[in-house]
């Protein structure tokens, strides 16, 4: 199957914020672009501008001043299929420059993805893009594979949603998966809000992208939040400056760690949810008592929102406080965790043992979209 580049499987990880796509067997995705579809705010006035009705990804990002930006995925689940189709089309034809009818495609999905959504993905792949074969894998399971494990609990936190997914011998345990509708986008929103308190105003969809960049470059997680706050009041050691696209320089201090603190204290943004540490603990407690030790010893972080410096130490500290005192706790934060879902997909799709797992076009034609529930679990 993996004979040369011509029929190399494609791996497409559809996050809420970024699309990661490339070829199975590669060690990193070739295309990473924002999952945005932008539509012009005003009708074109210049003749010959050749204005498109929609822009995707980086092009939408660069023209963001004149567009209204929309993300077709909300909280990890696809909410707008037309836009989703545009994004896949852009992925295959413009980014990877391949003909999807010549390659098997491995797609990823959020844990607890509604059944109808898996069927719709399957249908679009076979009917719109005519792929010869496809497969849908759960994001967290792929992250675990990428870390070289088959048992562990994955905390996957991206732009739209966070999940804790316990996995035993390669199978996700659905009864113990917990979902937290708190992720990168909420942190960006919170940072927009607390920067306003400093007198900086960020309001439009385009300005939100600037704040997201501030968050990614300067935020970190405090080991002891209260103590860090006290320090920041008396010393300027946490202050950093950031240059805006127009050349203006802003200073950001305690906001640096106040922003991601929301992951551990959702109440800071008025959410009545457990933080990521408590959600991880609750997820482990829903599992059989015999496998908990294996889970505590293999807590794997995955996704862009786990990229904050200090997250593994803080996670370790919080879980040690919750778990039985004799329990050995190990939090693993692989350096490539921003892309570990994609990397896991690349590994899986290139295994010789996986080749009989694909859903072939013939099987789809015979059984219809529901085949996805029988073949992908």
Curated annotation (Swiss-Prot):
Signal sequence annotation: none
Catalyzed chemical reaction(s): ATP + H2O = ADP + phosphate + H(+)
CDD domains: ASKHA_NBD_actin
Keyword Magnesium: no
Uppermost EC category: hydrolase
Location in the cell: Cytoplasm, Cytoskeleton
InterPro entries xrefs: Actin, Actin/actin-like_CS, Actin_CS, ATPase_NBD
Gene3D superfamilies: 3.30.420.40, Actin, Chain A, domain 4
Keywords noted in UniProt: ATP-binding, Cytoplasm, Cytoskeleton, Hydrolase, Nucleotide-binding
EC number: 3.6.4.-
Keyword Cytoplasm: yes
Gene Ontology terms for molecular function: ATP binding; hydrolase activity
One term under GO cellular component: cytoplasm
Similarity section: Belongs to the actin family.
Annotated function: Actins are highly conserved proteins that are involved in various types of cell motility and are ubiquitously expressed in all eukaryotic cells. Essential component of cell cytoskeleton; plays an important role in cytoplasmic streaming, cell shape determination, cell division, organelle movement and extension growth.
Note: There are at least 13 actin genes in potato.
Protein name as catalogued: Actin-58
Organism (species): Solanum tuberosum (Potato)
């Amino acid at each position: 199957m993996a004979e040369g580049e011509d029929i190399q499987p494609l791996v497409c990880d559809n996050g809420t914020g970024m699309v990661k796509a490339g070829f199975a067997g590669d060690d990193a995705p070739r295309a990473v672009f924002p999952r945005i579809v932008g539509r012009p705010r005003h009708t074109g006035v210049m003749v010959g501008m050749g204005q498109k009705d929609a822009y995707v990804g980086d092009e939408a990002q660069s023209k963001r001043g004149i567009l209204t930006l929309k993300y077709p995925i909300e909280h990890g689940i696809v909410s707008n299929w037309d836009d989703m189709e545009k994004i896949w089309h852009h992925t295959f034809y413009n980014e990877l420059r391949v003909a999807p009818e010549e390659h098997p495609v491995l797609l990823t999905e959020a844990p607890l993805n509604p059944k109808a959504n898996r069927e719709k993905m399957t249908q679009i792949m076979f009917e719109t893009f005519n792929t010869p074969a496809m497969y849908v894998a759960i994001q967290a399971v792929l992250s675990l594979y990428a870390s070289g494990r088959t048992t562990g609990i994955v905390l996957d936190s991206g732009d739209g949603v966070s999940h804790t997914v316990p996995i035993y011998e390669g199978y996700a345990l659905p009864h113990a998966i917990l979902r937290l509708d708190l992720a990168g986008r909420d942190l960006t929103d919170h940072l927009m809000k607390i920067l306003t308190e400093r007198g900086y105003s960020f309001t439009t969809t385009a300005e939100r992208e600037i704040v997201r960049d501030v968050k990614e470059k300067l935020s970190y997680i405090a080991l002891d939040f209260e103590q860090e706050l006290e320090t920041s009041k008396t010393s300027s050691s946490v202050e950093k400056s950031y240059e805006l696209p127009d050349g203006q320089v802003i200073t950001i201090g305690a906001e640096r760690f106040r922003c991601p603190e929301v992951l551990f204290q959702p109440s800071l943004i008025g959410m009545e949810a457990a933080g990521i540490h408590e959600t991880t603990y609750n997820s482990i407690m829903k599992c059989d008592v015999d496998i908990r030790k294996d889970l505590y010893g293999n807590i794997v972080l995955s996704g862009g929102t786990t990229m904050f410096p200090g997250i593994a130490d803080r996670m370790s500290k919080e879980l040690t406080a919750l778990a039985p005192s004799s329990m050995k706790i190990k939090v693993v934060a692989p350096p490539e965790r921003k892309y570990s879902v994609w990397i896991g997909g690349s590994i899986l799709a290139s295994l010789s043992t996986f080749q009989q797992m694909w859903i072939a076009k013939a099987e789809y034609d015979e059984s219809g979209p529901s085949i996805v529930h029988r073949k992908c679990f």
